[in-house]
């Protein structure tokens, strides 16, 4: 399959008509299939001064019909899980479609499946006998979903003049005005990793604070060490997600391991976990809730989570300092008590059993 040009949505490309890209052959591992792929990097010039890059290979992007950078539907800009669920409810799911959540946890199996899929795409001819009615129905459903979730931002971007300073300014304002207060109120950012006895049916965790370039298989491989995973939902752009275990026993084993890794002396804050010795992740018990969907909400939530990560680090440092101070104070009190006891013993006077007398 050709790697001359990536599959990128309009939102990731930015408002400019011409963009400069850097191409690196076999630059990184695909986040889905773990195979090396050609990475593209560019600056979208959308007012954020943050460069973008492709994070999945062309084969996985084509199988999911998604953008190689943001992993949203490349046509309608909606999350893949919502898209697939809507099409499934309407009875329009494709039989050969690879689901966005890969059930295999083995790296070699993922790579083999991707190789087969790539060979299939290279050999297949365009199917001209697809049902036009079903395609039209699917497009209608996805268009309505896009309007509801994104506020019809795709249409606004297409109509807006390119290379316009007003467009860039409006994009920044949209990010600032994105309301995520209701979503934040449901997220256990101040939770704990201590096993809750009051909710024995709970077997899910809220993960947050990880880097947006962490491969999802690193998280899934670590979680699978403790038992079978029911679902793993990660939103890289928002730096958060949920993992749900099939059994409570597996969930408790997962929590206990994090508590005993030597990084969580303060049990009042979410547990800290370091994956692959370079990806810090905070973990807390929490029932799975809907996460953000639009680009503006994801960006704003990622900023909030970054701030929360700094606050949690400061709390852990204060807790550690207080613990050291208390220990030193107790040691000093113990030393003073021993010294006082020693001085008391040295000042004791001789007391004769009988009255002294002078010869």
Swiss-Prot record:
Subcellular location: Nucleus
Biased composition (Polar residues): 340-349
One GO BP: RNA splicing
Keywords from the named record: mRNA processing, mRNA splicing, Nucleus, RNA-binding, Spliceosome
Start and end residues of each stretch annotated as Disordered: 324-359
Assembly with partners or alone: Associated with the spliceosome.
Family, per entry: Belongs to the SLT11 family.
The protein, known as: Pre-mRNA-splicing factor SLT11
Species, as recorded: Debaryomyces hansenii (strain ATCC 36239 / CBS 767 / BCRC 21394 / JCM 1990 / NBRC 0083 / IGC 2968)
Underlying gene: SLT11
């Amino acid at each position: 399959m050709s790697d001359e040009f990536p599959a990128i949505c309009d939102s990731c490309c930015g408002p400019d008509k011409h963009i400069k890209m850097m191409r690196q052959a076999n630059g990184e591992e695909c986040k889905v299939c773990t195979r090396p792929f050609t990475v593209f990097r560019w600056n979208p010039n959308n007012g954020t001064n943050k460069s973008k890059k492709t994070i999945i290979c062309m084969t996985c992007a084509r199988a999911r019909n998604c953008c190689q950078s943001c992993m949203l539907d490349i046509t309608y800009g909606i999350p893949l899980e919502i898209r697939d669920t809507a099409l499934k409810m309407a009875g329009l799911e494709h039989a050969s479609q690879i689901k966005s959540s890969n059930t295999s946890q083995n790296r070699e199996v993922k790579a083999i499946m991707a190789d087969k899929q790539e060979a299939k795409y290279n050999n297949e001819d365009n199917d001209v006998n697809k049902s036009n009615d079903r395609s039209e129905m699917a497009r209608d459903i996805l268009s309505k979903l896009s309007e509801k979730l994104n506020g019809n931002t795709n249409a606004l971007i297409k109509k807006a003049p390119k290379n316009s300073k007003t467009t860039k300014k409006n994009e920044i304002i949209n990010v600032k005005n994105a309301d995520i207060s209701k979503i934040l109120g449901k997220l256990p950012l101040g939770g704990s990793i201590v096993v809750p006895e009051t909710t024995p049916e709970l077997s899910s965790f809220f993960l947050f604070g990880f880097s947006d370039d962490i491969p999802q298989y690193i998280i899934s491989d670590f979680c699978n060490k403790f038992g079978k995973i029911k679902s793993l939902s990660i939103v890289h752009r928002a730096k958060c997600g949920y993992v749900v275990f099939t059994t409570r026993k597996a969930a408790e084993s997962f929590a206990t391991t994090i508590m005993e890794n030597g990084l969580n002396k303060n049990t009042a804050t979410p547990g800290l976990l370091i994956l692959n010795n370079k990806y810090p992740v905070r973990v807390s018990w929490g029932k799975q809730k809907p996460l953000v969907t639009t680009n503006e909400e994801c960006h704003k939530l990622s900023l909030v989570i970054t701030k929360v990560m700094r606050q949690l680090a400061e709390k852990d440092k204060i807790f550690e300092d207080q613990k050291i101070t208390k220990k030193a104070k107790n040691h000093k009190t113990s030393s003073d008590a021993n010294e006082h006891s020693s001085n008391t013993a040295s000042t004791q006077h001789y007391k004769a059993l009988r009255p002294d007398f002078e010869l």
